[in-house]
Amino acid sequence: VFNIESRVHGSRGIPGDWRNTKEHGGGMVLDWGVHLIDQILMMLSERKLISLYATLSFVTNEAVDDGFKILLNYDDGLTCHIEVGTSNFINLPRWYIQGENGTAIIEDWNLNGKIVMVSDWEKRDAVPVVTAAGLTKTMAPRTSETIKEYPLPSVHSDIKDYYRNVFKAIEGKEEIFVKHNEVMRSMRLMEAVMCSAHENRVVFFKDSQLRWE
């Protein structure tokens, strides 16, 4: 896997409550961003994050961000794109993942999607397609005999497990799932997002705890 894209899109702007007030923690970075960022950090916890670049949008609200785009770069060449938009009347896929031998797509919250993988690397001679600029082989689609489609795997989960763990941790029966250092990493990354967007610069991380300058 060399690229992961995680998106959540809507078309209603920011709701008229605390989400559109800066002093109450409003804006999409703090509302949705914290969840998508934490998700990526947990998925890629064994990889080293080296830099970040982010932009914020203010289409429907000047006080707080109503959307954002974050590009994460890892030391092994992996890139991650995290995006939230509230002025999207046509949604892009919830997940889009590229690997050397295939691509996976998850369209929505209902896990509609598929995995397409190369089944034959030997048949390389593509049939040219006609474009406005003429013939091209570069963007010619693969033929059915060189790729294979797979369904998305189903993974069972229960959001209540988190709350059960908090209850048992308070009782001293279990160790807490979410550690303080994991929370701190997410908070530091969100601060780096704000810095990158406001100063229009790449933020470089100094260590695995995502300290930055």
Predicted feature descriptions by range:
Residues 1-61, 200:
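Predominantly a Rossmann-like dinucleotide-binding segment in NAD(P)-dependent oxidoreductases
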Residues 70-77, 97-99:
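Active-site beta-strand termini and strand-to-loop segments that position acidic
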Residues 41, 71, 163-167, 184, ...:
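Non-transmembrane alpha-helical segments in soluble domains
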Residues 62-68:
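A short, glycine/Asx- and small/polar-enriched loop/turn
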Residues 158-162, 190-199:
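Stable alpha-helical structural segments in soluble proteins, enriched in small hydrophobic residues
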Residues 101-181, 203, 209-213:
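C-terminal glycine/acidic-rich active-site capping loop/insertion
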Residues 1-2, 195-213:
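C-terminal capping/lid region of NAD(P)-dependent oxidoreductase domains
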Residues 34, 61, 83-91:
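Glycine-rich phosphate/pyrophosphate-binding beta-alpha loops
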